[in-house]
């Protein structure tokens, strides 16, 4: 009996010590458990899903499927890596490691995150940035300068490390916070053109003569500035917007950006000037800056993109355009649909946004070419369902407002919702008809102006009727 009492006493003592330890743990180690994040974006819609109650199960199923195809320990030096697909002989690019780390932290898989990050660190070059191309046997490629860095990858890796620090704390085997700060410093020193703040596409080339708008991630840079205190990153974000303003001189109002350009928005020598597989990511990276920080430049640019793609509907999106808007390809795939859905998060057209959400869920690329499009698809699904919060916010509740918040914006408009009940159906058509006959006066006037010409008349009624019988794909039209 004495031994039993002694054991009970020891157990109680251990529990008491653990209780004190738990109370002493830093708050950011227990602030959240990943998907589903119980947060709300401070600006614009938080989710464009049709049924939010189904989102978590869908995302977790997609995550398990993605891991089964993309995560491998083969050729990873004892760690784990993100492999591409059969079309590239299952190699690894640093871009994919950035995507994998963002996904792993959002789905709260710390062990996987650590394995992926250790692989990343095993492939740091002399500038403290990741080799951009490694073959399936863990060899850095030489034919394409694989030992250099790709800026978009390292900026995603840095953001993932900040997420990790805020979700899990930095007192474990990996000091995520220190790793993030070091990487962010290396990025600034080697991937930003000094004097101009132009984002270089890599640590060994580019700048004002050639840059890549799909690498522009202004929300990331604002987080870096707040996290490290290095406010030069805010100037990098501003320069990204300035370059896109230059592009607008040449894109005929489409909002489309090229794969590559100069800092003056003109074609870069020897590089694609079309909206193709690089440029497709621009809407995703830019829209996040509106959701997190309310930047009106992000909203304006993404609203233009949404308006352009709405003309053909979600099912009409293809995998290549001139920046003036002419189609140059006809494949309909995940690489292009998800990022357009992300762009719609600035709230220009919520009817079209929901159409884009459904198409993003529905369209998944075949596995032979599955790496790129399906990775972007899952990342954008996280964002457009409210599961990609600012890592510097309270990840367990409401986001912390920006330090200099912009004025609150008016509610987003659901065009066609004439009676204001949140739906667009025949009741709205009847209400609009009664309004035109002057039998009612109290309607949702902005939503009733479905052609956005500033007037409510029979043209709006015709367009709403055509939308309800599905002869036009979206509102406004």
UniProtKB/Swiss-Prot annotation:
One of its GO terms (biological process) is cellulose catabolic process. InterPro entries: 6-hairpin_glycosidase_sf (IPR008928), 6hp_glycosidase-like_sf (IPR012341), Dockerin_1_rpt (IPR002105), Dockerin_dom (IPR016134), Dockerin_dom_sf (IPR036439), EF_Hand_1_Ca_BS (IPR018247), Glyco_hydro_8 (IPR002037), Glyco_hydro_8_CS (IPR019834). Belongs to the glycosyl hydrolase 8 (cellulase D) family. SUPFAM superfamilies: Six-hairpin glycosidases (SSF48208), Type I dockerin domain (SSF63446). The gene is celA. It comes from Acetivibrio thermocellus (strain ATCC 27405 / DSM 1237 / JCM 9322 / NBRC 103400 / NCIMB 10682 / NRRL B-4536 / VPI 7372) (Clostridium thermocellum). Residues 1-32 form the signal peptide. Its EC number is 3.2.1.4. Keywords: Carbohydrate metabolism, Cellulose degradation, Glycosidase, Hydrolase, Polysaccharide degradation, Signal. PROSITE patterns: CLOS_CELLULOSOME_RPT (PS00448), DOCKERIN (PS51766), EF_HAND_1 (PS00018), GLYCOSYL_HYDROL_F8 (PS00812). This is Endoglucanase A. This enzyme catalyzes the endohydrolysis of 1,4-beta-glucosidic linkages in cellulose, lichenin and cereal beta-D-glucans. It comes from the Bacteria.
């Amino acid at each position: 009996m004495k031994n039993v009492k002694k054991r009970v006493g020891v157990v109680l003592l251990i529990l008491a010590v653990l209780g004190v330890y738990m109370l002493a743990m830093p708050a950011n180690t227990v602030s959240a458990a990943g998907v589903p994040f119980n947060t709300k974006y401070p600006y614009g819609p938080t989710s464009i899903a049709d049924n939010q109650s189904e989102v978590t199960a869908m995302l977790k199923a997609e995550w398990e499927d993605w891991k089964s195809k993309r995560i491998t320990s083969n050729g990873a030096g004892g760690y784990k890596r993100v492999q591409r697909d059969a079309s590239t002989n299952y190699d690894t690019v640093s871009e994919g490691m950035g995507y994998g780390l963002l996904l792993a932290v959002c789905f709260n898989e710390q062990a996987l995150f650590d394995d992926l990050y250790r692989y990343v660190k095993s492939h740091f070059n002399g500038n403290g940035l990741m080799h951009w191309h490694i073959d399936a046997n863990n060899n850095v490629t030489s034919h394409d300068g694989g030992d250099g860095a790709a800026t978009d990858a390292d900026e995603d890796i840095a953001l993932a490390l900040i997420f990790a620090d805020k979700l899990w704390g930095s007192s474990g085997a990996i000091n995520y916070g220190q790793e993030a700060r070091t990487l962010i410093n290396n990025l600034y020193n080697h991937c930003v053109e000094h004097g101009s703040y132009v984002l270089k596409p890599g640590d060994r080339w580019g700048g004002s003569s050639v840059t890549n708008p799909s690498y522009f991630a202004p929300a990331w840079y604002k987080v870096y500035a707040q996290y490290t205190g290095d406010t030069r990153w805010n100037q990098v974000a501003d320069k990204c917007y300035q370059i896109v303003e230059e592009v607008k001189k040449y894109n005929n109002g489409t909002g489309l950006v090229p794969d590559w350009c100069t800092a003056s928005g003109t074609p870069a020598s020897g590089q694609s000037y079309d909206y193709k597989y690089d440029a497709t990511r621009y809407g995703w990276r830019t829209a996040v800056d509106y959701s997190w920080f309310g930047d009106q430049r992000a909203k304006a640019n993404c609203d233009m993109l949404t308006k352009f793609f709405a003309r053909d509907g979600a099912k009409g999106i293809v995998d290549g355009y001139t920046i003036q808007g002419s189609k140059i390809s006809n494949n309909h795939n995940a690489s292009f649909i998800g990022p357009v859905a992300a762009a719609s998060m600035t709230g220009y057209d919520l009817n079209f946004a929901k159409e884009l959400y459904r198409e993003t869920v529905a369209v998944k690329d075949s596995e032979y070419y599955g790496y790129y499009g399906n990775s972007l698809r899952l990342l954008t699904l996280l964002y457009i369902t409210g599961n990609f919060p600012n890592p510097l916010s309270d990840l367990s509740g409401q986001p912390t407002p920006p330090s200099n918040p912009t004025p609150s914006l008016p509610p987003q408009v659901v065009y066609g919702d004439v009676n204001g009940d949140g739906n667009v159906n025949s009741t709205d058509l009847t209400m609009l008809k009664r309004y035109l006959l002057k039998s009612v006066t109290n309607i949702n006037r902005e939503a009733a102006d479905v052609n956005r010409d500033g007037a409510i008349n029979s043209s709006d009624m015709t367009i709403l009727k055509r939308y309800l019988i599905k002869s036009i794909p979206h509102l406004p039209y």
